[in-house]
Amino acid sequence: MELKIARAIIKHGLEDLYEYSEVDVAVVGAGPAGLTAARYLAERGHRVVVYERRFSFGGGIGPGGNMIPKIVVQEEAVPVLKDFRVRYRPVGDGLYTVDPAELIAKLAAGAIDAGAKIILGVHVDDVIFRGDPPRVAGLLWVWTPIQMSGSHVDPLYTQARAVLDATGHDAEVISIASRKVPELGVEVRGEKSAWAEVSEKLVVEHTGRVAPGLYAAGMAVCAVHGLPRMGPIFGGMLLSGRRAAEIIHKDLVEYAVRA
């Protein structure tokens, strides 16, 4: 029995890694923006992989507001909640409360059911770039425990037509690209202090491509563009993920036509 268990895990697990070593879109970060984008991209027929450094998904949703088990979503994001069949409760002034555990579960299930592949415990170490002027063409990654141990282990590659940084406050992928491929012309300015009403709108408006092949969604957008933070209101994250999917889909279609 033990041998069968081991061989089943090795065979099918390595088959998944092989299959998703080349994708249309590599999303880094399985938080609200990343999972939302993954679902809408997969629904449009794109091969999507989501890498999450933790062994769980949801990003900042789980702790709710200061560990109180509720988050807030505004009216504009209700259509996204409906797409994922997430229940919500009105509180007035166009605001609604949502259960964090339900939102995490349904965002992840929605992305998976649409065809996206989520791989947990992955630390993205670097990007692949091509051309002059350069464009981002994929990722280098190792398992998170390897990165945490400080061991020098060469990473593996994932080739992607588009890379979406949905890593949150630190914009980890874009930070790496800006430092190691300065020719991309990307700068991470860092987010500002809180102004929720303004930031919820700006994060959606500024979502999109930051360099050829490289995109930002969610709090990574705030980090790149120096926008205010917003706290435990998540409508902007959901809308940013949806907008990122729309922009990436459009770019991939246009790129395929040009190619």
From Swiss-Prot:
What are its E.C. numbers? 2.4.2.59
What are the protein's GO molecular function terms?
Answer: iron ion binding; pentosyltransferase activity
Pfam families on file: Thi4 (PF01946)
Where along the chain is Fe cation bound?
154, 169
Q: Which UniProt keywords apply?
A: Iron, Metal-binding, NAD, Thiamine biosynthesis, Transferase
For activity, the cofactor(s) needed are: Fe(2+)
Chain sites annotated for binding NAD(+): 33, 52-53, 60, 124, 152-154, 219
- Which InterPro entries does the record match to this protein? FAD/NAD-bd_sf (IPR036188), Thi4_fam (IPR002922), Thi4_prok (IPR022828)
Catalyses which reaction?
hydrogen sulfide + glycine + NAD(+) = ADP-5-ethyl-4-methylthiazole-2-carboxylate + nicotinamide + 3 H2O + H(+)
Which residues does the record give as glycine binding sites?
A: 229
Q: Does the keyword NAD apply?
A: yes
Q: So, what pathway does this thing act in?
A: Cofactor biosynthesis; thiamine diphosphate biosynthesis
Tell me, which GO biological process terms does this entry list?
Answer: thiamine biosynthetic process; thiamine diphosphate biosynthetic process; thiazole biosynthetic process
Q: Which family does it belong to?
A: Belongs to the THI4 family.
Q: In UniProt terms, what function does this protein have?
A: Involved in the biosynthesis of the thiazole moiety of thiamine. Catalyzes the conversion of NAD and glycine to adenosine diphosphate 5-(2-hydroxyethyl)-4-methylthiazole-2-carboxylate (ADT), an adenylated thiazole intermediate, using free sulfide as a source of sulfur.
Complexes and interactors? Homooctamer; tetramer of dimers.
- Protein's recorded name: Thiamine thiazole synthase
Which species is this record about?
Answer: Pyrobaculum neutrophilum (strain DSM 2338 / JCM 9278 / NBRC 100436 / V24Sta)
